[in-house]
């Protein structure tokens, strides 16, 4: 059985209700990315996944597993579990009886619109109880909120960084970003911790790309973000795996390629994993032998290497190489199939042939491959990147230091500003205090062109979003430019954004950022990497 939603938390949460000061009637908390210490490749996050959390947990699961269940069954399960695990002889359940009788979650959530870019330490959402007797509920929900939302945010942020890199190189080498929506392809599902985490992460990927092999992600955004079940949401192509190649045997590999091209897929796109035995033999012998068939097909053959150093396999070990290994896959395909030189002066492979690489790709390697292709005179869109669990599973809640922390409470009718600031910490865990407003610069300036932004927190020169804490409820309610909007209250979803809306919002955020033609933050982070080592060999 799955854990009942009213017990889907940490053990210590069960006892917090009795620990708050007597007379507590309100608890107000925030969700904040506190640090990019472990993610120097991004100083901002893409806010995404809250609507999924609200629909799946606050609405569906609470309705199915709590409110619609007989009260006596709920109480019996709760009492039995707590007695047997916490050693309690008497188990207090009146708070659950009251909540069950109420029939909905007395919770209010305000949040940035999903698809918004938020800098480090900027609160992205707030949560509070709406009825005084349920003060305990706010932070009771912390665990399920945190475990559900950190991964789609982190994966959406990583996908966005891939998209920025690929967009920038596409503009430099082709003059547009056409096709980049399919240049980043999600390969991660098999390496994620579960189908659910693969779905959540895969939904984040789909905020920036349409290419995916993670089918659960498409159904996820269909259910939670009103996305159609078609290629505009996510799409892939037919492709072989090593079991198929091995089934025919090494001696018949050339005939297998021909069989696939002529009999199985006489038209359309398909991909063939090509390193089952001798990758460079496939590239330099089999593909030239099949050139006429490939060029006469109405479609594209996509070559997929799956081992070796990704950067060297795709771009070669030398900038001006002579052997296949020195030239790399893209240059070898150009030598065999040719193509065109675009207006920007970069080589674009013939439309009948292409390449994808999906083994051990990360942001640094994708950047290095793009950098090398540009240096060799090739459009960077000649390669598709399979972004797998080596990218998406290598992250935790600590990647951006996500934390839900109480910053305000009402006790005996008095609003109290709560905060933590451990002396043994480096400042990362220092929380905001009181209630919070988040300001979008353009909204503030529209209302008051003379506004003094020094009264707000954040990077005054770069960030679109700034924030102010230390406020009480009245001061927050009087603010006319709070970017945090109500999205859930008293069991009701107040905002139901589509994936299309979120994609458009994120694209608009991207358009506000200058396309970097010089050294990017990621390039600075790479320093003495595979890019530099390659250039030193020439």
Regions from the PLM with identified roles:
Residues 2-61, 209-210, 214-215, 220-228, ...:
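Gly/Ser/Thr/Ala-enriched C-terminal appendages of enzymes
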Residues 49-90:
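Aromatic- and Gly/Pro-rich amphipathic surface segment
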Residues 2-40, 78, 86, 91-93, ...:
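Buried, small/hydrophobic-residue-enriched core segments of structured protein domains
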């Amino acid at each position: 059985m799955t854990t009942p939603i009213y017990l889907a938390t940490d053990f210590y949460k069960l006892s917090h209700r009795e620990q708050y000061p007597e007379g507590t009637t309100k608890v107000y908390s925030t969700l904040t990315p506190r640090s990019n210490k472990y993610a120097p490749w991004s100083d901002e996050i893409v806010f995404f996944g809250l609507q999924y959390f609200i629909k799946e947990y606050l609405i569906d699961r609470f309705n199915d597993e709590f409110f619609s269940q007989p009260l006596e069954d709920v109480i019996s399960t709760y009492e039995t579990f707590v007695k047997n695990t916490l050693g309690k002889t008497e188990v207090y359940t009146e708070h659950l009886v009251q909540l069950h009788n109420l029939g909905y979650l007395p919770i209010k959530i305000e949040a940035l619109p999903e698809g918004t870019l938020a800098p480090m330490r900027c609160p992205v959402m707030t949560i509070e109880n709406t009825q005084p007797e349920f003060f305990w509920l706010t932070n009771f929900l912390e665990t399920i909120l945190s475990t559900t939302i950190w991964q789609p945010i982190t994966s959406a942020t990583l996908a966005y960084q891939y998209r920025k890199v690929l967009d920038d190189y596409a503009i430099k080498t082709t003059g547009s970003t056409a096709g980049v929506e399919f240049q980043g392809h999600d390969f991660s599902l098999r390496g994620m911790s579960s189908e659910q985490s693969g779905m959540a992460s895969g939904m984040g990927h789909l905020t920036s790309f349409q290419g995916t092999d993670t089918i659960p992600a498409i159904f996820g955004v269909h259910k939670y973000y009103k996305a159609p079940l078609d290629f505009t949401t996510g799409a892939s192509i037919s492709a072989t795996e090593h079991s198929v190649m091995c089934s025919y045997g090494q001696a018949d590999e050339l005939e297998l390629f021909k069989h696939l091209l002529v009999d199985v897929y006489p038209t359309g796109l398909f991909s063939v994993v090509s390193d089952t035995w001798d990758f460079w033999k496939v590239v330099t012998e089999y593909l030239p032998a099949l050139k006429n068939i490939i060029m006469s097909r109405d479609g594209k053959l996509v070559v997929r290497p799956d081992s070796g150093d990704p950067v060297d396999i795709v771009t070669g070990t030398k900038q001006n190489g002579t052997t296949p290994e020195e030239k790399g896959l893209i240059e070898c395909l150009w030598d065999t199939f040719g193509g065109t030189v675009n207006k920007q002066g970069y080589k674009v492979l013939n439309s009948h042939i292409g390449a994808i690489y999906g083994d051990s790709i990360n942001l640094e390697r994708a950047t290095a491959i793009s950098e090398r292709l540009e240096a060799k005179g090739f459009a960077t869109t000649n390669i598709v990147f399979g972004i797998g669990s080596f990218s998406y599973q290598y992250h935790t809640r600590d990647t951006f230091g996500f934390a839900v922390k109480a910053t305000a409470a009402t006790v005996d009718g008095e609003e109290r500003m709560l905060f933590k600031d451990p002396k043994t910490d480096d400042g990362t865990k220092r929380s905001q205090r009181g209630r919070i407003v988040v300001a979008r610069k353009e909204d503030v300036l529209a209302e008051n062109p003379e506004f003094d932004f020094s009264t707000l927190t954040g990077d005054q020169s770069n960030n679109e979003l700034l924030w102010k804490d230390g406020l009480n409820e009245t001061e927050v309610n009087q603010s006319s430019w709070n970017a945090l909007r109500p999205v859930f209250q008293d069991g009701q979803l107040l905002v139901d954004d589509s994936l299309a809306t979120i994609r458009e919002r994120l694209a608009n955020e991207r358009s506000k950022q200058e396309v970097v033609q010089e050294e990017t933050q990621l390039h600075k982070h790479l320093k003495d990497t595979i890019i530099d080592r390659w250039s030193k060999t020439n």
